[in-house]
Amino acid sequence: MGKIIGIDLGTTNSCVSVVENNAPKVVENAEGGRTTPSIIAYVEDGEVLVGAPAKRQSVTNPKNTIYAVKRLMGRKFTDPEVQKDIGLMPYSIIAADNGDAWVEARDRKMAPQQVSAEILRKMKKTAEDYLGEEVTEAVITVPAYFNDSQRQATKDAGRIAGLDVKRIINEPTAAALAFGLDKQDKVDRKIAVYDLGGGTFDVSIIEIANVDGEKQFEVLSTNGDTFLGGEDFDQRIIDWIIAEFKKEQGVDLSKDVLALQRLKDAAEKAKIELSSAQQTEINLPYVTADASGPKHLNLKLTRAKLESLVEELINRTAGPCLTAIKDAGVNVSEIDDVILVGGQTRMPAVQDKVKEIFGKEPRKDVNPDEAVAVGAAIQGSVLSGDRKDVLLLDVTPLSLGIETLGGVMTKMIPKNTTIPTKHSQVYSTAEDNQPAVTIKCFQGEREMAAANKLLGEFNLEGIAPAQRGMPQIEVTFDIDANGILHVTAKDKTTGKENKITIKANSGLTEEEIQRMVKDAEANAAEDKKALELVTARNTADALAHSTKKALEEHGASLEASEKEAIEAALKELDEAIKGSDKEAIEAKTEALGKASQKLGEKVMAAEQAKSGGAAPGAAPGGAQQAAPDADVVDADFKEVDDKK
């Protein structure tokens, strides 16, 4: 059985970890980073860039550079949060045929799952390059407060990326695993995980206990806000810059897509700098232009000003924390440790708020960017059977129920119930001789069903004619370990049954997922072809370069016909390199190798004469073995090949 890798699929950054020799390791990507920006760019020639390369070109290609797509996962286009994002994002957010929020780039309409799959493919490839073997299984993390649709969407993204998602695990729970397994003591402890990431906020109260030599992680409660995170902090800075620039220059930058992308980069940079400095300068020359000429932006932003801009956002995290403490049935004084997760928790004002809420200093010995991926990898090693000393008991974040007479939400499974779990309840008909019932499944805490999230609906037909209230319809809610809901309705009189895995009345159909899997596979094949072409070009370039050099130095000792044959072969190879036919490049490379064989012999003879004998390891062959700097060219070629 291969490794089950752990992936933190973040709003702003993603991270991948593997467990080796019982120790988790965060894997560096091809660019050398331990985290990868969750940014995907669709460029003119059809290439898809992921991570740092996508971020680098975002200023010049804002409409086709997708970021923070996690905020759209499993959401309807009409959701208020999505509508708010439409006005802020430089790329197009559109309504799919089923009402879901999708994105559009280069005239391609794509589900958020498809875009997220590009990030997951990059994480998969990063792990494969490190392990030297194919990876097909993963544990992927989600915010604890993700609902059923969002969890299903994350699982679908994994499938599109070619991964069998063995488990969806909550981010705070994963961070608790990373923290708890690090502790060698046998002391039971209650911890609070405060997770303020790029797009979401979660808080979980978790008890870590030692039971018969096994570490048991039991989630007591969880709460959060799936539309609150570092991206919102950045937006407050962007809004402030726009207002200040309009005051000074009379120009509104909010309609300038290129300028907005530069502002986003500058805002993020300023926010990060102000975590350690008291003041920073935002300097953007030539940010825009009007009839009077180019305009430059130069503003000073202090930490105090930043804190006043985002104070309301920080305060919004207090409510979910207090609710989680209450739901866990503990006092604040009983919480032993507070763990910070997510890059936004590096902000001093956030740390001060955490101290104020929990009455103690948060711990600084957990890496907020990597703990979630590490925990996911640990859970992967548990699922693969490599680790047997860990038991994880997670919960469902929101109540689940069905709509009953009068539009009431009748709860079947209350929030913070340990999963997996199953619950059955018997209902009846509302009218005489009613032949069918519609089961509508909701998730949320409101008393009226319509105010909660409709997850899906289905019919149970063929109910035997009877007076209202007589038929017995047993509805069973079954939540698996991923937090995904399966519902069954059964007429106890006739034995008729209907069941569904909740996929919402939106979400991707099986056909759509299969099509997207095929698209992703086609992209992988295209990537392989592109890499092979680059490799062929590099090999050809190296040979052409060294042959030209050898021809300059030793061409005079060749017969005219030999020299002409080499020059003709060089010319043909140069032409082939300009094209995109790999076979032609390889054929012309081979032809040049044969044509320059005599030249190679002359070069070798000259080298031997110079050194007074055969060079160690010298071998007969083409001129590429003769050129003094051939090794340099080869090393360059290898570097390209490594990075793929």
From Swiss-Prot:
Segments of this protein annotated with the region Disordered: 603-644
Pfam families linked: HSP70
Swiss-Prot/TrEMBL induction comment: By stress conditions e.g. heat shock.
Basic and acidic residues composition bias: residue spans: 635-644
Positions where Phosphothreonine occurs in the chain: 200
Biased composition (Low complexity): 612-630
InterPro entries for the chain: ATPase_NBD (IPR043129), Chaperone_DnaK (IPR012725), Heat_shock_70_CS (IPR018181), HSP70_C_sf (IPR029048), HSP70_peptide-bd_sf (IPR029047), Hsp_70_fam (IPR013126)
Record GO terms (molecular function): ATP binding; ATP-dependent protein folding chaperone; unfolded protein binding
Alphabetical list of Gene3D superfamilies matching this protein: 1.20.1270.10, 3.30.420.40, Actin, Chain A, domain 4, Substrate Binding Domain Of DNAk, Chain A, domain 1
Cysteines engaged in disulfide bonds, as pairs: none
Alphabetical UniProt keywords: ATP-binding, Chaperone, Nucleotide-binding, Phosphoprotein, Stress response
Xref: PROSITE patterns: HSP70_1 (PS00297), HSP70_2 (PS00329), HSP70_3 (PS01036)
Superkingdom: Bacteria
Entry similarity comment: Belongs to the heat shock protein 70 family.
Role: Acts as a chaperone.
Name under which the protein is recorded: Chaperone protein DnaK
Record organism: Polynucleobacter asymbioticus (strain DSM 18221 / CIP 109841 / QLW-P1DMWA-1) (Polynucleobacter necessarius subsp. asymbioticus)
Gene: dnaK
